[in-house]
């Protein structure tokens, strides 16, 4: 299934490989709140485009943070993989000469990177596994600021959600493979995805045009308020065969902790009908895939969309507010 992406007026779509020609901006709906933007989608047959500490510990002792002693650093350095310099964690396998390499790198190697000896047959190093179970390892993102040390069983789960891991480009459905720090996200969007429209204010209208385009389509725009930037996403996809649905959600260009300080409301309103969704914005670290999979966002099918649409255009009122902590 093709998956074109789209953004705001007079812009190229930010999430597609070949951006189409510029599009003349559409005027906002007369009934719109203070700020409004038209987001056009590009689909088949369409030329329009929218808008290192180590501490002796046992399993379950939890992570910690603190100064690193030379002795502890020397101990954890024994577990460093000579290829990727991450840590070799259980199950620990060695070459015939006793050298270690992590399991991820081992799958790509035909010989030991240290002595060039054979890696097969696989030999377990049970002594090092016992030592690893009594050591707290630094997070792999320690060099970018994470100070936690963790038992090896907790390390992978933490690193999947670590606030210091690189951020990926938040554009949904994009082929963009950019990664970088949180501070660099907005600069990336402004330079690599210039077509994304940004509106100022806590109350705006997200107007998606051509919602009847076939296939999977994304509409994206930015909202700036309270000193932060929020990404508004509307996706149309076939989550179940033969049943197309729309998914609308708000992401914060920020951390999960920062996101907890805000709330958002999405509202479809018209023809004496109203459909509302209120929630806490998700951090761009989490993305939209999991929220859509769990329907943890504003969800409605094409029949509902047509109740609120006007000539194939759908306006969503978006309100961002702060939460009292």
Swiss-Prot record:
Gene that this polypeptide is encoded by? Siah2
Q: Which family does it belong to?
A: Belongs to the SINA (Seven in absentia) family.
Q: What is its EC number?
A: 2.3.2.27
Species the sequence originates in: Rattus norvegicus
The UniProt annotation places Zn(2+) 1 binding at: 139, 146, 158, 162
What residue spans carry the region label SBD?
131-323
What's an example of a GO molecular-function annotation for this chain? ubiquitin protein ligase activity
Q: Where is the composition biased (Low complexity)?
A: 34-43
Q: What is this protein called?
A: E3 ubiquitin-protein ligase SIAH2
Give the subcellular location: Cytoplasm; Nucleus
Catalytically driven reaction(s):
S-ubiquitinyl-[E2 ubiquitin-conjugating enzyme]-L-cysteine + [acceptor protein]-L-lysine = [E2 ubiquitin-conjugating enzyme]-L-cysteine + N(6)-ubiquitinyl-[acceptor protein]-L-lysine
Residue ranges of the SIAH-type zinc fingers?
A: 134-194
Region (Disordered) residue ranges read: 1-43
Positions of post-translational Phosphoserine modification: 6, 16, 29, 69
- Please describe the organ and tissue distribution of this protein's expression: Detected in brain (at protein level).
CDD domains, from UniProt?
Answer: RING-HC_SIAH2, Sina
Renumbered zinc finger spans (RING-type) = 81-116
């Amino acid at each position: 299934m093709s998956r074109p992406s789209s953004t705001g007026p007079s812009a190229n779509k930010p999430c597609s490989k070949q951006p189409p020609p510029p599009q003349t901006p559409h005027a906002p709906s007369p009934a719109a709140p203070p700020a409004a933007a038209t987001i056009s989608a590009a689909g088949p047959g369409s030329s329009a485009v929218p808008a290192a500490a180590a501490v002796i510990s046992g399993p379950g002792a939890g992570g910690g943070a603190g100064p690193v002693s030379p002795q502890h650093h020397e101990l954890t350095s024994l577990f460093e993989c000579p290829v990727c310099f991450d840590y070799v964690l259980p199950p620990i396998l060695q070459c015939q000469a006793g050298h270690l390499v992590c399991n991820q790198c081992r799958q790509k190697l035909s010989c030991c990177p240290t002595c060039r000896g054979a890696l097969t047959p696989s030999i377990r190093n049970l002594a090092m596994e016992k030592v690893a179970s009594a050591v707290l390892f630094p997070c792999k993102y320690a060099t970018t600021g994470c100070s936690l040390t963790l038992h090896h069983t907790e390390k992978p789960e933490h690193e999947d959600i670590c606030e210091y891991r690189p951020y990926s480009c938040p554009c949904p459905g994009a082929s963009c493979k950019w990664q970088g720090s949180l501070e660099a996200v907005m600069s990336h969007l402004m330079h690599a995805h210039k077509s994304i429209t940004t509106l100022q204010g806590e109350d705006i209208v997200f107007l998606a045009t051509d919602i009847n385009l076939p296939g999977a389509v994304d509409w994206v725009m930015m909202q700036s308020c309270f000193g932060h930037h929020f990404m508004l996403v509307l996706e149309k996809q076939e989550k179940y065969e033969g049943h197309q649905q729309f998914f609308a959600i708000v992401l914060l260009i920020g951390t999960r902790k920062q996101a907890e300080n805000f709330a958002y409301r999405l509202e479809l309103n018209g023809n004496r009908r109203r459909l509302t969704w209120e929630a806490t914005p998700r951090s761009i670290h989490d993305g939209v895939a999991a929220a859509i999979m769990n329907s943890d966002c504003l969800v409605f099918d094409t029949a509902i969309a047509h109740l609120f649409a006007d000539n194939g255009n759908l306006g969503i009122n978006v309100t961002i507010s702060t939460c009292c902590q």
